[in-house]
Amino acid sequence: MSAIDSQLPSSSGQDRPTDEVDRILSPGKLIILGLQHVLVMYAGAVAVPLMIGDRLGLSKEAIAMLISSDLFCCGIVTLLQCIGIGRFMGIRLPVIMSVTFAAVTPMIAIGMNPDIGLLGIFGATIAAGFITTLLAPLIGRLMPLFPPLVTGVVITSIGLSIIQVGIDWAAGGKGNPQYGNPVYLGISFAVLIFILLITRYAKGFMSNVAVLLGIVFGFLLSWMMNEVNLSGLHDASWFAIVTPMSFGMPIFDPVSILTMTAVLIIVFIESMGMFLALGEIVGRKLSSHDIIRGLRVDGVGTMIGGTFNSFPHTSFSQNVGLVSVTRVHSRWVCISSGIILILFGMVPKMAVLVASIPQFVLGGAGLVMFGMVLATGIRILSRCNYTTNRYNLYIVAISLGVGMTPTLSHDFFSKLPAVLQPLLHSGIMLATLSAVVLNVFFNGYQHHADLVKESVSDKDLKVRTVRMWLLMRKLKKNEHGE
């Protein structure tokens, strides 16, 4: 195997552009850039409580409480991930945390059980978050299984998976009876063109907020065309306190806990891919300790979610694309986003206003952002060796093919057991598992481990230094005729 296929991310303490990731911008820029991140993730963040509330037949007031709790928890967990707590948790990268779609189907199944209902979802969420927090070190130590070849496959599969979200947004959003309406497509295309023009001709900070300006432009255009629905804005309150266990004491059902834990382990693997993608974008090499700290926040954030009437949390892939587009790598921007999310959770009127942004407006921006994630994965794969190691072609081809299966054929796995559905319907998870297994099969695991030891050992460096000193001494003697 070539060297580039076997290099592993080194320790997080060296060779990292801390001036970019840790740089604190001016308050005005932090607010604007933070709001840009919030607008990108907002539709996905509120979709989960809306879906669960609708399927469980909850009242409008109960669903509104779920949304407020969800936004509040997204903000808290984002702050934990970006700021961190000592050496225990927090990857300290520009990450936005939000509820995961992977757990929606199991949560609905749990909630439909009349014996436990919504309280059973909260109980399973809290318990599964606690269990996976304990498992984070074990999962994080799988880093040797993710050389650049596998990392490239994972990031490419993330891009391929989420770009479908952008396409659905551009057409009006899934479930919209007017899906594909030419007006939606036209506005989405106009937003895309507007973002490209800002990116091409604007300079400095204006270029960095091209996505935000595009969303504002699309919102105004939609409003002038009577395509903005502001219903509920007048009735929404200005302030609401998010309290823990507002629906009652959680119910801890063993079967539900096991189901949710299995789903969260899958989410953890996807989170590793998100972290690796973000590390590649910001130019920061991640160690297994970085990954473990990030995964711990996933687990602790899930516990917080269950306690405060919300659901499992994970890093949001849409915002990874935004970091790539804006080239603003400061984690303090996402810290600003976390504060804004907390405020939105406590100010329902603002939350309703942001929720009124049509999905087709976000679609134009989504095509740019999600395509950038895909391009990052392709860039990593382009650096791998396919000339002397033909096995790498098989690994990439098969892994991406398997990963695209649930996206291209929704019914492909429909006849298989229901317990496997969360795994089989995650294209990212399928691509990741395929790439890891195939890479170990073709290229071996022990070979990677040996290279890791060499990369962190300075024994060879000392030997080479002594040899170089002896050579220089010999050359000087020859010059003086000694």
Swiss-Prot record:
GO terms for cellular component: plasma membrane. The chain crosses the membrane at residues 30-50, 63-83, 93-113, 116-136, 143-163, 179-199, 205-225, 262-282, 338-358, 360-380, 393-413, 422-442. Keywords: Cell inner membrane, Cell membrane, Hydrogen ion transport, Ion transport, Membrane, Symport, Transmembrane, Transmembrane helix, Transport. Changing T100S: Decrease in activity. It comes from the Bacteria. Proton-dependent high-capacity transporter for uric acid. Also shows a low capacity for transport of xanthine at 37 degrees Celsius but not at 25 degrees Celsius. This is Uric acid transporter UacT.
